[in-house]
Design a protein with these regions (language model features):
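N-terminal mature-domain region immediately after signal-peptide cleavage
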Residues: 1-175, 180-188, 192-196
């Protein structure tokens, strides 16, 4: 926890202050209700799916060239009159997770931030992003993803959780999503994103 927080806390405060404030508030709320935690633990917990990519840079060089994380999700989206009966979007997503962590992705969170767009997402307790990657925004954008297994390249830049949350909240178009997701892309939790509007 300390090592993850040491690597990402400063960046979180500097580049994603709103998310840091949310995580600090989550920690305060947990503590006030008898669940002892720290903002450092909340940052590490939000980085959970990115840890295998990040950790490969901390271990021997062989792990940076081989393997990578396994597939974790599968998704499907059909958009438009040529693909669906009524021209509306059809979207499906399933998660390939172990019971130990998958059991916690059982929250549907409706978030209406002071700035940006309201959105609904499937998520886990104390997360500021979906992680299970299924969401719908008030801007009319639906999103999900399918993981790219075996992807190894990683650079310490902005984690996927911060980038996709920023896109969900502030993205006005599919082009915005592309720009936000590609900006400072670290390569962590590699996946193919499917969006519809």
């Amino acid at each position: 926890v300390k090592e993850v927080s040491n690597d990402f806390k400063e960046m979180t405060i500097r580049d994603f202050k709103q998310l840091y404030d949310e995580m600090d508030g989550i920690a305060d709320g947990c503590n006030a209700n008898g669940c002892k935690t720290t903002v450092d633990e909340i940052i590490a917990w939000n980085f959970y799916y990115s840890i295998p990519y990040w950790y490969s840079t901390k271990s021997d060089s062989r792990n940076r060239k081989e393997g990578g994380s396994s597939d974790r999700c599968s998704a499907f989206m059909a958009v438009g009159k040529d693909w669906t009966t009524d021209g509306e979007i059809v979207c499906a997503h399933n998660s390939f997770t172990d019971f130990i962590d998958g059991q916690f992705s059982n929250i549907v969170l409706d978030l209406n931030p002071e700035k940006g767009h309201r959105f609904i997402m499937q998520t886990s307790p104390c997360w500021v992003w979906s992680g299970s990657d299924f969401f719908v925004t008030a801007k009319g954008i639906i999103g999900t993803e399918t993981t790219i297994g075996g992807f190894v390249p990683y650079e310490k830049r902005f984690p996927i959780g911060y980038r996709i949350r920023h896109a969900m909240q502030y993205g006005n178009s599919l082009d915005d999503y592309c720009k936000i997701l590609l900006h400072e892309n670290s390569g962590d939790y590699a996946n193919s994103w499917l969006f519809g509007d």
